[in-house]
């Protein structure tokens, strides 16, 4: 049984994940024999999921095996009681916790490469699983031989080797292993694919499951193209402020993208900047309908912390409380520099004293101001609409009133002509 050993070098510290099943035990056997000179150091990791009664016996067997072959072994017992109590997916929860521990141990061991025993049949099973459960459009279709993690790499040297070859190899060299009885239980989707669906397809001479590998190659090429296109779009159209986590993108530019690319763009942005994962395709499609509607302004709740705001030509992601905690009323009795929400007010000493005290507040229903250079008044709300001011900005913008409660300034949009030089309002941080 030949391993693909291109994933590590002779001076590497390699770590192999061993379950004591036939696949990982055959991999370990080869690493100790035909490939014993292909690495600098070998360490084993074993996870006891604590779900099966045989887990203790398997761990003891592996301890004795590794001691006999002078291999360092580290064992982790997982607590999956939370998933059992809630009837959650044990397999998915176990995988997440397993790889969290792998990440930790690879860092502690300062190792270079983690080897897993995924083989050709696992690859075909995974491809089929992702097609049938709808997860094929935003993920690669199966395993890559090489995957990158934080600080190390995962390599799968058996990915071109079939289960049949592994069984023949085990029988030839009498390699000890444990059979996980839960692998026969078809209540688990992957087991059902492996035990029932794939054999049924193989019985038909006109069908070949192996053709899925061609589909994977084509699919993954398209996936890479989408990822590249998404990065190009983000680089060109997305503005992001790291401190406030405020993200802005052209609504029209986003709407012009095909839906498949929209999903990839949002996947990239939400996972990178907001640690949001696994938004369903159905949810995305509902958002896209709203984004492409003629409605000028609306909001969508992402979480209890983040919100999507659509404001005229912009698609914005920001903190939900951006418009919740701000000044409502402030009194200014003398010239100076003042701050109101996200605005800076410079009140000059030349401002007539008869106008003091000034009142600074946010908008109120029915607010009007005197037009400059002509008779008549205009509603503040109409000014906001004409200037396409987003709703949450309207709720924060300072409106300045004189002693007689007449509006003499509306944010950075309007100042009464007679005092224009003496009240300067700018967004905090603007030059």
From Swiss-Prot:
EC number assigned by the record: 6.3.4.19
List the SUPFAM superfamilies hit by this protein, alphabetically.
Adenine nucleotide alpha hydrolases-like, PheT/TilS domain
| Primary localisation category | cytoplasm
Q: Which reactions are catalysed by this chain?
A: cytidine(34) in tRNA(Ile2) + L-lysine + ATP = lysidine(34) in tRNA(Ile2) + AMP + diphosphate + H(+)
Instruction: Return the SMART domains for the record.
Output: TilS_C
Q: Where in the cell is it found?
A: Cytoplasm
Which biological process annotations from GO are given for this protein?
A: tRNA modification
Enzyme class, UniProt record, top EC level = ligase
Q: Which residues bind ATP?
A: 19-24
Q: In the record, what terms sit under GO molecular function?
A: ATP binding; tRNA(Ile)-lysidine synthase activity
For this chain, the family text in UniProt reads: Belongs to the tRNA(Ile)-lysidine synthase family.
Q: What is known of its domains?
A: The N-terminal region contains the highly conserved SGGXDS motif, predicted to be a P-loop motif involved in ATP binding.
Name of the protein in its database record: tRNA(Ile)-lysidine synthase
The source organism is Staphylococcus aureus (strain N315)
Q: Which gene encodes it?
A: tilS
């Amino acid at each position: 049984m030949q391993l693909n050993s291109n994933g590590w070098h002779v001076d590497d510290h390699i770590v192999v994940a061993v379950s004591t099943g036939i696949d990982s035990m055959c991999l370990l056997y080869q690493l100790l024999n035909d490939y014993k000179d292909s690495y600098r150091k070998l360490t084993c990791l074993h996870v006891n999921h604590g779900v099966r009664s045989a887990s203790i016996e398997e761990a003891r067997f592996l301890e004795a095996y590794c001691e006999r072959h002078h291999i360092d072994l580290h064992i982790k017992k997982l607590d999956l009681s939370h998933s059992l109590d809630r009837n959650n997916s044990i397999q998915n929860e176990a995988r997440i916790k397993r790889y969290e521990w792998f990440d930790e141990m690879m860092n502690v061991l300062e190792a270079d490469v983690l080897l897993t025993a995924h083989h050709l049949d696992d690859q075909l099973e995974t491809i089929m699983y992702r097609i049938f459960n709808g997860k094929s459009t935003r993920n690669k279709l199966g395993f890559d031989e090489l995957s990158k993690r934080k600080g190390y790499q995962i390599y799968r040297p058996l990915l071109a080797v079939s289960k049949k070859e592994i069984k023949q190899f085990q029988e030839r060299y009498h390699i000890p292993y444990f059979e996980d009885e839960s692998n026969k239980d078809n209540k688990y989707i992957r087991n059902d694919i492996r035990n029932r669906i794939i054999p049924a397809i193989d019985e038909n001479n006109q069908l070949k499951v192996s053709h899925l590998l061609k589909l994977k190659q084509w699919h993954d090429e398209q996936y890479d193209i989408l990822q590249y296109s998404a990065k190009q779009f983000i680089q060109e159209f997305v503005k992001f402020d790291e401190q406030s986590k405020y993200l802005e993108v052209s609504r029209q530019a986003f709407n012009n993208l095909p839906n498949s690319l929209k999903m990839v763009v949002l996947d990239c942005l939400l996972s990178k900047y907001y640690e949001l994962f696994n938004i369903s395709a159905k949810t995305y499609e509902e958002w896209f309908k709203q984004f492409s509607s003629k409605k000028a302004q609306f909001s969508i709740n992402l979480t209890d912390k983040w919100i999507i705001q659509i404001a005229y030509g912009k698609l914005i992601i920001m903190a939900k409380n951006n418009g919740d905690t701000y000044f409502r009323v402030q009194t200014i009795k003398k010239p100076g520099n003042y701050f109101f929400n996200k605005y800076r007010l410079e009140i000059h000493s030349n401002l007539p004293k008869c106008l003091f005290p000034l009142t600074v507040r946010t908008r109120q229903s029915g607010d009007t101001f005197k037009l400059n250079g002509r008779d008549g008044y205009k509603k503040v709300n109409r000014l906001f609409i004409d200037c396409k001011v987003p709703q949450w900005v309207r709720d924060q913008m300072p409106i300045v009133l004189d002693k007689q409660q007449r509006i003499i300034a509306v944010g950075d949009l309007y100042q009464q002509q007679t005092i224009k030089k003496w009240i300067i309002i700018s967004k905090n941080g603007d030059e």
